[in-house]
Amino acid sequence: MGALAGNPDAGLAVLADVSEDAAEKARHLVDSGAVELTVADVDDDLYAETVLHLDGHHARACIAGDHTNVFLVSRDDEVLESKERPAAGHVPPTAALLQGLSLAKIYDFATTVDIERIEFITEAERLNSALVDAGRDGSYGIGEGAAILGSIDRGMASDDLCTRMTAYTAAASDARMGGAPLPAMTNSGSGNQGIVATVPVTVAADYAGVDHERRVRALALSHAVALYAHAGLPVLSAFCAATTAAMGAAAGICLVLDGSYSAVERAVASMTGDVVGMVCDGAGCSCALKVSASANAAGRAALLSLAGRRVPGTNGLVHDDVDAAIRGIGRLGTEGMKQTDPEILSLMMAKQTV
């Protein structure tokens, strides 16, 4: 697609204005067998290299470390643009800052900061709620959100808080992954993580009828906790980060329905004993399933916490110290899943599809 269309100055929106004609030409290029896809043998967490051959010439572009970090552009081996390639395993300054925080500090910030400083988070609700609306009719992706809502209408699923969270979050992900021409407010660089950190909290806020300030603070807490929980993970790995975003959602839901730090702490601790460890097998329509499972887990963790209960620290990845549990999850995603990622790639490549 990038060889035929796109705006190189638009960052992650590089393909936002691609025409259907260009998309059809790209599909024809793939169908013709002109595109070869291989797995790069590199140590980088995120790496992509494209080489284009045409009329006896070739051009090369390489990305590493971040989705928009083009560190090398060349034509016929003549370097046109270059900058230092990020070292494998490099921890960006923002991630290092987040790793130095604690759940208690984040809670204190979200609940005491001047509300004007965090009003911007309402944009997350506006953008991601538009994705919910777009995905509710089932016209995008696998239509999971619409399927759940239809099950409610037919009496096959209950119309309760957790089911609504699950359905609406799935609908937004359906739209996001199914190509709806709408932006998402991201979290940790991911639209789906932004959806998980936003939609369950807004559903809870609508259910509880809380005032604007409580709503804003809950969204801010959710997104901040999601960033904190994700900070120990590589920029890309076999670890599905919808689960860390859901830790933020669980915190935000508790702030809506209870407000106390103890409730938030119990919910986040319980999340480390639930869906954490779910694998990422690449971006696709099935992300809606993982996203909705994570949202549902967040809702259940919040309800468990409101009953004064949590998963005890003697269980597996859970820890009595919630910050230690979060650090452990970062270690799991960084060290524990090193071999998982290449195995997933191998299974995908074995299908011989582009």
Swiss-Prot record:
InterPro entries: Ser_deHydtase-like_asu, UPF0597. GO terms for molecular function: L-cysteine desulfhydrase activity. GO terms for biological process: L-cysteine catabolic process to pyruvate. PANTHER family: UPF0597 PROTEIN YHAM. Belongs to the UPF0597 family. This is UPF0597 protein PPA0217. It comes from Cutibacterium acnes (strain DSM 16379 / KPA171202) (Propionibacterium acnes).
